[in-house]
């Protein structure tokens, strides 16, 4: 039996899905990740347990299903719905925005980049630009370039945009498996307090950040271990008394739109496995302890006595995990040479220094770069698109492909493509790329 024929062991019948997980042990080579170690070691003695077959209720049948409500997923759902497709959005937490909101990674990077005339210009438009403008109008955004936003205001704005677009929102639910028919994805199993259910869809968009769906569908990918951190916010930073005897400068992060509140980033430990739940749990506790101890030390410093820990992020700062092996792998050379693509779905910028041809080029000099639609398409699975930090690119681009702006751009591109595919009754890989670009322009995206 081929991997794809087994993936979920499903039979669609009536109003329920028969699920037979645990029918056999999958070989490592069948996952397309033969060079990878298992995420977790099995129980001592290699013990396993069989999950009984059961009937799974179908919650909904829809045009487009987006899994993951971070910047990419939110933009994808809005774009899909605005394109006329009935759209469901499933998010495991109680908010949209992912690391932008729940992760307290508050800067919208990178809204600007250098064009061919060596001028700095705005590159984030469309749905991402609309989000930014709404936050500015609320007084909840500071800085014109790479604005820093208030997370609660951003949650509100994203909720409103989802509601206005007519997206069907499902919080507190987690995708647990995919429903496959030969090489086509037909839906997703979700877990929640309501139990296991299925949502069937004509097109599914993987915006999980970790590529959970394309992994479950059997696509090939790379795994990149990277630094994982935890952001926190400090309050009363406007009460710091620099005139106190013994005052010394302390690292208290950067300002936010709320007076007296700063956000403080943490790079964290290098080479961390974001796919290992035990590792994530250990990091969560360790980082929270370190942040608490750090703030107590700050409060002992003359002049900082009134500073307090406002909150730690509800999400760990996972920067990278799975990277899709898709139809086209975006390269460093592409992004540094203004390469144009016939199937461009958006443009992003850079926020960090890049070593290129033996020279360190600062972000302030780095060019804007196009993102091709092919980089969002898996090689084998039909009716599946990928957006966010796990689309197809070279590892050297990790600092630019994982930022909020890029996630918004890839999300809108995938959502518009999904809506167009449903409208035309085609698989996403078969849609007319010119029509996709026209649709994106109608939605306000800038394609260069």
Q: Model-derived features: where do they sit?
A:
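N-terminal secretory signal peptides
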Residues: 1-5, 27-31
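N-terminal export signals
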Residues: 5-25
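A short, basic/flexible loop-to-alpha-helix module at the beginning of a structural domain
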Residues: 46-61
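Flavin (FAD/FMN)-binding glycine-rich loop and adjacent Rossmann-like elements that form
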Residues: 55, 127, 155, 172, ...
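Beta1/beta-strand and adjacent pyrophosphate-binding region of the FAD-binding site
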Residues: 59-70
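N-terminal Rossmann-fold NAD(P) dinucleotide-binding loop
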Residues: 73
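Conserved N-terminal/central alpha/beta ligand/cofactor-binding core
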Residues: 79, 85-86, 91-177, 232
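Conserved beta-strand-loop-beta-strand element in the redox core of flavoprotein oxidoreductases
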Residues: 179-197
């Amino acid at each position: 039996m081929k991997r794809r024929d087994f993936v979920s062991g499903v039979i669609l019948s009536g109003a329920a899905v028969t699920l037979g997980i645990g029918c056999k042990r999958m070989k490592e080579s069948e996952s397309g990740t033969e060079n990878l170690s298992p995420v977790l070691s099995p129980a001592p003695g290699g013990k396993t347990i069989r999950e009984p077959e059961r009937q799974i209720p179908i919650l909904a049948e829809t045009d487009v299903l987006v899994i993951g409500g971070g910047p990419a997923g939110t933009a994808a759902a809005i774009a899909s719905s605005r394109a006329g497709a009935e759209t469901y959005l499933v998010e495991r937490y109680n908010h949209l925005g992912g690391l932008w909101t729940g992760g307290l990674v508050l800067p919208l990077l990178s809204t600007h980049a250098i064009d061919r005339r060596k001028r700095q210009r705005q590159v984030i438009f469309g749905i991402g630009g609309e989000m930014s403008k709404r936050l500015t109008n609320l007084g909840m955004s500071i800085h014109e370039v790479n604005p820093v936003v208030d997370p609660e205001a951003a949650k509100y704005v994203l909720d409103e945009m989802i509601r206005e677009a007519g997206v069907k929102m499902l919080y507190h639910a987690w995708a647990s498996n995919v429903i496959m028919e030969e090489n086509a994805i037909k839906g997703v199993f979700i877990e929640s307090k309501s139990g296991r259910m299925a949502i069937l869809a004509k097109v599914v968009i993987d915006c999980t950040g970790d590529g959970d769906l394309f992994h479950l569908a059997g696509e090939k990918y790379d795994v990149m271990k990277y630094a994982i951190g935890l952001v926190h916010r400090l309050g009363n930073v406007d009460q710091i008394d620099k005139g106190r005897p013994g005052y010394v400068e302390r690292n208290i992060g950067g300002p936010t739109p709320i007076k007296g509140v700063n956000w403080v980033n943490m790079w964290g430990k290098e080479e961390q496995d974001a796919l290992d739940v035990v590792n994530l749990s250990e990091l969560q506790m360790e980082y929270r302890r370190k942040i608490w101890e750090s703030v107590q030390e700050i409060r002992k410093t003359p002049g900082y006595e009134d500073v307090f820990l406002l909150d730690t992020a509800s999400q760990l700062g996972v920067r990278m995990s799975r990277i899709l092996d898709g139809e086209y792998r975006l390269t460093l050379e592409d992004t540094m040479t203004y390469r144009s693509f016939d199937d461009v779905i958006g443009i992003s910028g850079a926020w960090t220094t890049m070593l290129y041809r033996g020279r360190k080029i600062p972000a302030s000099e780095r060019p804007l770069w196009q993102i091709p639609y092919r980089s969002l398409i898996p090689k084998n699975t039909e009716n599946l698109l990928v957006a966010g930090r796990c689309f197809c690119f070279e590892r050297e681009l990790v600092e630019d492909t994982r930022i909020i702006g890029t996630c918004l751009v890839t999300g809108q591109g995938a959502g518009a493509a999904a809506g167009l595919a449903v409208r035309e009754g085609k698989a996403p890989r078969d849609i007319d790329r010119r029509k996709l670009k026209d649709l994106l322009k109608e939605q306000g995206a800038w394609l260069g």
